[in-house]
């Protein structure tokens, strides 16, 4: 199976969260869309020009700009995929368990067509010809080479049953994460790589969890190589990524996901920390998204609640330089911190 994940014109509305990474590489739940799609087959990214230049120069490197594993640089589909079903996925699709199951169902059914969300292509199933000819192959090549869905839009494709959730604004990342994390952890547990060492705590081989750790509710999933110090309080659902370290006396609260090699201390709630970021000291980080290569100093406190307890408005600068106020409808919303901040 060949998978093409593409960024459309609305990806810039996600703001600083996707300024230095593809939208498909945002961690939501315990996984990014790219990593979730990798279980379906060979994944190619179609990204904005500045990211495409970075990907093109990754030969020989182990880690991407955004802290993920180096992607395959192959531009042609694997030989086995010629003359087979292929799927195109919008990079703004939320990698929730329901969405991933829907995409898997589309692939297994193999019916040619599209799934749209308010008129926007969320996914399309194409039939690639064995000789590389035909309209589907032309649309595939056009999208891969130019990033434009124009040719894809001209195809006569039936509307397929099902729906897929898309990210629209920065705060959607937090909302989607809170809704997706439990199902995302369930998909990890289904792999059988995690053993339950105490009620609600699931630990991979090679991880280290001190005896004095308290798990008040699960599931808490700890990946290989992670380390959790003594006197830590864990409230699930939560994910501790590979090589991450939780310092003694920390409180990791529900809906928190720590990416690979993160360092965490103090109190963290309903927050995503992308790989290689640090908040190792006391302080509070809540309902936030922290990009890769970010270091939050000792005592850092993020406010996630208005003094009035009312809904939070988000003031955002758009790509054209204009400003817009977004009514998030959320009572709790913290910091949106991009990569390298």
Task: Go through the PLM ranges and name each one.
Residues 213-222, 227-337:
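Flexible, glycine/small-residue-enriched loop-and-beta-strand segment within the central core
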Residues 209:
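Short, conserved interaction/coordination micro-motifs, predominantly
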Residues 1-200, 205-206:
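Terminal amphipathic alpha-helical/low-complexity segments used for targeting or macromolecular assembly
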């Amino acid at each position: 199976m060949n998978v093409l994940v593409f960024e459309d014109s609305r990806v810039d509305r996600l703001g600083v969260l996707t300024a230095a990474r593809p939208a498909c590489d945002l961690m939501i739940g315990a996984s990014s869309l790219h990593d979730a799609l990798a279980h379906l087959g060979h994944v190619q990214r179609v990204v904005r020009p500045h990211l495409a230049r970075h990907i093109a120069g990754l030969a020989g490197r182990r880690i991407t700009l955004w802290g993920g594993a180096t992607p395959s640089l192959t531009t042609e589909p694997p030989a086995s995929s010629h003359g087979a079903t292929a799927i195109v996925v919008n990079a703004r699709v939320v990698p929730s368990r329901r969405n991933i199951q829907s995409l898997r169902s589309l692939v297994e059914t193999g019916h040619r067509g599209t799934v749209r969300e308010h008129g926007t292509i969320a996914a399309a199933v194409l039939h690639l010809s064995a000789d590389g000819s035909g309209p589907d192959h032309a649309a595939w090549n056009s999208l891969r080479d130019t990033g434009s869905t124009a040719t894809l839009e001209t195809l006569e494709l039936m509307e397929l049953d099902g729906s897929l959730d898309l990210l629209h604004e920065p705060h959607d990342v937090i909302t989607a994460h809170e809704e997706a994390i439990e199902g995302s952890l369930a998909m990890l547990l289904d792999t059988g790589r995690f053993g339950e060492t105490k009620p609600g705590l699931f630990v991979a081989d090679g991880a280290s969890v001190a005896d004095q750790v308290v798990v008040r509710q699960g599931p808490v999933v700890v990946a290989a190589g992670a380390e959790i110090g003594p006197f830590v309080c864990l409230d699930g659902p939560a994910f501790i990524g590979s090589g991450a370290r939780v310092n003694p006396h920390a409180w990791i609260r529900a809906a928190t996901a720590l990416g690979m090699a993160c360092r965490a201390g103090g109190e963290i709630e309903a927050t995503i920390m992308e790989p290689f970021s640090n908040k190792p000291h006391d302080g509070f980080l809540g309902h936030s998204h922290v990009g890769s290569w970010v270091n939050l100093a000792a005592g850092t406190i993020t406010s996630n609640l208005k003094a009035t307890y009312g809904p939070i408005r988000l003031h955002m600068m758009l790509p054209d330089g204009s400003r817009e106020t977004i009514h998030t409808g959320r009572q709790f919303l913290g910091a949106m911190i991009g990569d390298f901040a």
